A protein has these predicted regions:
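An amphipathic, basic-hydrophobic helix/alpha-beta surface used to engage anionic
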Residues: 32
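Conserved P-loop NTPase motor module
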Residues: 1-4, 175-212
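P-loop/Walker A phosphate-binding loop and immediately adjacent motor/lid segment at beta-alpha junctions
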Residues: 150-188
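Intrinsically disordered, low-complexity N-terminal regions enriched in serine/proline/glycine
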Residues: 24, 28, 141, 180, ...
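Short, aromatic/basic amphipathic alpha-helical patches
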Residues: 43-52
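Conserved P-loop NTPase motor cores
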Residues: 1-23, 27, 37-41, 56-163
Length: 212
């Protein structure tokens, strides 16, 4: 899950992860499906090679069910990019349930040897329906001053005191386009990253942080 206001760097980060040689997701997937009203309009579109039947400008139940039928029993490594489709999701509770089902059964949807990964973007973290955002295993948060958003992130994810959480935010967002990366399933001492550099705590309550 990637959360950031317009211009924060969400799209650039997706392109970097997927398209740049040696990066995390470069050439890791057999199929990529994109659900986005805007990614197809990028200048020098890096997704031009993706077949038309894997690129959608909206997201609904019928489209997603059709895609799930296509990948069933293929054994493929599949990536869904759900970019800027929060409004489609929020207004459709059946779609929300289907997405939750996908997120909770990612390893079984494409058959033996296959898997489904999902990258979802939003301009505001708490605009994503709670049942969906609570299934996220990795969360990337760009700078925000939205107190309700930060309080939601803190209440749902953060196990350190709020004062320390805000010190982590201040330390992380010292440069434009920096992001806080959370590995949700890690223990509290190993879940925080400034960009992709893990924050090291000398003690459980010490915020004198050092990068790997």
């Amino acid at each position: 899950l990637i959360s950031g206001k317009p211009g924060s760097g969400k799209t650039s980060k997706i392109l970097n992860l997927l398209c740049k040689r040696g990066k995390m997701y470069n050439k890791k997937f057999d199929r990529v499906y994109i659900f986005s009203p805007s990614l197809g309009t990028l200048k020098d579109n890096p997704f031009e090679s993706i077949p038309d039947d894997q690129f959608f400008t909206e997201l609904d139940n019928e489209i997603l069910e059709s895609v799930l039928s296509e990948i069933k029993d293929t054994g493929d490594k599949v990536l869904f990019i759900m970019d800027d489709v929060v409004n489609d999701i929020k207004k459709n509770t059946a779609l929300q349930r289907l997405i939750c089902k996908i997120l909770m059964n990612r390893r079984h949807l494409a058959g033996q040897g296959g898997s489904v990964s999902v990258i979802m973007t939003t301009q505001v973290y708490n605009k994503i329906p709670a049942p969906i955002r609570k299934t996220a295993s990795h969360i990337m948060i760009y700078h925000t001053r939205n107190k309700k958003e930060l309080d939601c992130i803190f209440d749902e994810l953060i196990l350190v005191p709020k004062k320390e959480f805000y010190e982590i935010l201040n330390y992380t967002f010292d440069k434009k386009n920096n992001f806080l990366y959370l590995v949700v399933d890690n223990d509290v001492e190993n879940m925080f990253y400034k960009n992709f550099n893990q924050l090291q705590f000398k003690t459980k309550t010490d915020l004198n942080m050092e990068l790997n």
